[in-house]
């Protein structure tokens, strides 16, 4: 599975753009701020129906315009699929071969994708919400049962919190409605917690293996899932928190409060890990994500690497390149402000590759290399 070509209209700093890609390696070279990351984001959007950069679709529209459109032609098992993502300033639409999905969420996991960025260490430093979001994105691509449960849970948590706020404003609480919300939250929350526990157990040994291959040292690493939802008495704990929920006007127990502890030598890596160890940790986690998605979906995910070599020492860069060349069997996109640094990917590489020079929203393909001339796309 890979993306063959793309067409953008009013997408960030690209008023209009059409590009054809290699099924192997694609390098976006250009200065910082030229639009390399925006190109990666357009591919991510077509795979996951949302940006990894912008918090709203409105922020994706080219300045001064009222809409955007992104089209991608994907190859899967010798068949071509045309994916179109439109936003008219108010409403988004997603179609495959001009046919709309009954629910946009049906697209999640069909064309799996993973992005590595220099900001991935924020997963370690930031709040539990960011870690939950990361694992939710991973598990949702891997398992639609998980995704459906997550959508239901998020819906009912909003409804329940709205009911709690009404009570705070002096309105009587509809206990029948509240009980219905509670039932649905407990039901979908248990599915989410069970799936998180199940998939983390599958992910952990893959992650630990990648960390050991990337790190020059021999630190012990671990990821622990923290939840009380799977405890036998959780339903009673949930009900007992109702008085507190009324006071705070929000639901205080459930999987939306879970966390994932990142550990190195049995200590929180947030406090005890060096900058290099933290970067190695998240890179290993993303590579493990690739392997898990490949196993669950039956497809090679598209791997997007955004300036990932920035601030990595030479040894870790060399190890990362070796692992990517050895284990990443699908399509790869790399952005780099220093293409000479990324050129090591192409040395002794049998994969087809293309280099694109990006300058302030304008993109040109560099002349094909000898390996490209000798390789069919």
UniProtKB/Swiss-Prot annotation:
GO MF entries: ATP binding; single-stranded DNA binding
GO cellular component: cytoplasm
UniProt xrefs under Pfam families: SMC_N
Subcellular location(s) of the protein: Cytoplasm
Keyword set, alphabetical order: ATP-binding, Cytoplasm, DNA damage, DNA repair, DNA replication, DNA-binding, Nucleotide-binding, SOS response
SS bond list: none
Origin superkingdom: Bacteria
GO biological process assignments: DNA replication; DNA synthesis involved in DNA repair; double-strand break repair; SOS response
InterPro entries from the UniProt entry: DNA-binding_RecF, DNA-binding_RecF_CS, P-loop_NTPase, RecF/RecN/SMC_N, RecF_2
Binding site for ATP: 30-37
Family recorded in the similarity comment: Belongs to the RecF family.
Name of the protein: DNA replication and repair protein RecF
